[in-house]
Amino acid sequence: PFDAVLRDGTPAVKHNQWPRLWADLNRSAQRRLGDDARLVFHRSSWRGAPSQVGMFWAGDQLTNFDGRDGMLSALLGMLSGGVSGLTLNHADVGGYLGIARDPLQIIRTPELLKRWAEWSVWTPLLRTHEGNLPDLHAQVFDDDVVADFARFTRMYAALADYRQEVLEQAGQDGVPAM
């Protein structure tokens, strides 16, 4: 943050170094724990990050189909990140941020959750999140979602060997994983 109080007194100079410092801290903790298999994902980056970060995350999208900050924006951000070298990235299935303040209502619907899970089958990581309004948002365990979500997770599992090949190629050639 620009208002940070640092020993050398230069928060603006340090500003763009925070993502790297955070990744360094996480890698150090993993080494100390002897747990290099644990996945840590990041949503900020820097030049050289792909070789040092296990997974990127698109951030807290709105729980809608929108291209400015919803499902479409996550997909576009991941594709753009992929061609920029961030080959291992994902988004919260269904988005995260809902709004329930009249007159604005942005609540995750079963249809959005299913469509988001469907395209996430083709990403390096299929990960759910209950979102910031769990009692209002559709969830993967809801009666009108669970069968479709189970089908998508079976598809994701069935693609494991293919995904491994794609990820290995991404690591060797820098080709986006999606």
Give the positions of each predicted feature.
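Catalytic-domain carbohydrate-binding cleft regions of carbohydrate-active enzymes
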Residues: P1-M178
